[in-house]
Amino acid sequence: MLIIETLPLLRQHIRRLRQEGKRVALVPTMGNLHDGHMKLVDEAKARADVVIVSIFVNPMQFDRPDDLVRYPRTLQEDCEKLNKRKVDYVFAPAVEEIYPHGLEGQTYVDVPGLSTMLEGASRPGHFRGVSTIVSKLFNLIQPDIACFGEKDFQQLALIRKMVADMSYDIEIVGVPIIRAKDGLALSSRNAYLTAEQRKIAPGLYNVMNSIAEKLIAGNRELQEIIAIAEQELNEKGFRADDIQIRDADTLQELTETSKRAVILAAAWLGQARLIDNQSVTLAQ
């Protein structure tokens, strides 16, 4: 496994891979890797000749400076995990390599609508940062496929739209959420939880399941369902942030013709903001 930190060296290897006709898969990450990331790597390995994992804590997508500072950086451990998985390349650039002139005045990629709704409304600029760094990685690495986790449901929808709108010839693969045995979705931010909070954390998944059962039963009193869910979360020790029930295919409000719903949930537990989602097929 080769660790690449500079753009010239990356371009040199990408040119060679293209000349050799290799099928390249990209797994973009911010590091602090867990089993959910490893599932992305496994999916990439099954679909391509060469797997490149990027590890870059992207300052452009953080809406709070304190969150950027405390985000876990575990490059050595990450590389050890990826080496065991027989990943071909790790691209781990410094911030100065990606943004040599700083963030002020930086050209960015914005996906209208999707970047400012739902999660984007509570985290201004976040999705603009995501779409910008992903487009930069696509331009640099020129992958045939790229793997993203379905845990970040809105992010995946945003990437798919950006790829379509910008005419990238890249297959976007969504990989299902990996959960702990108690239902908690794996996330790098779970590291912020204390031992006691970790015991409470699966409550978010349980509340989503309760919402799903109501939707499957035909209940469409969405505001009432959401209010009850928020109350349940608060009683469990969370601080409910945002719960939405949307059309899974458009992320717009549910209509009578919606075939699938997605429950999008975000809640604070101590210093950790946990997000999760669940899709439900609606009775027609």
UniProtKB/Swiss-Prot annotation:
- In its UniProt entry, the species of origin is given as Salmonella heidelberg (strain SL476)
Q: Which CDD domains match?
A: PanC
Which named protein is this?
Pantothenate synthetase
Q: Which residues bind ATP?
A: 30-37, 149-152, 178, 186-189
Q: Which GO terms fall under molecular function for this chain's record? A: ATP binding; pantoate-beta-alanine ligase activity
Q: What more does the record tell us? A: The reaction proceeds by a bi uni uni bi ping pong mechanism.
Q: Which gene encodes it?
A: panC
- List the keywords (alphabetical): ATP-binding, Cytoplasm, Ligase, Nucleotide-binding, Pantothenate biosynthesis
Q: Where in the cell is it found?
A: Cytoplasm
Q: What does this protein do?
A: Catalyzes the condensation of pantoate with beta-alanine in an ATP-dependent reaction via a pantoyl-adenylate intermediate.
Q: Which pathway, per its entry?
A: Cofactor biosynthesis; (R)-pantothenate biosynthesis; (R)-pantothenate from (R)-pantoate and beta-alanine: step 1/1
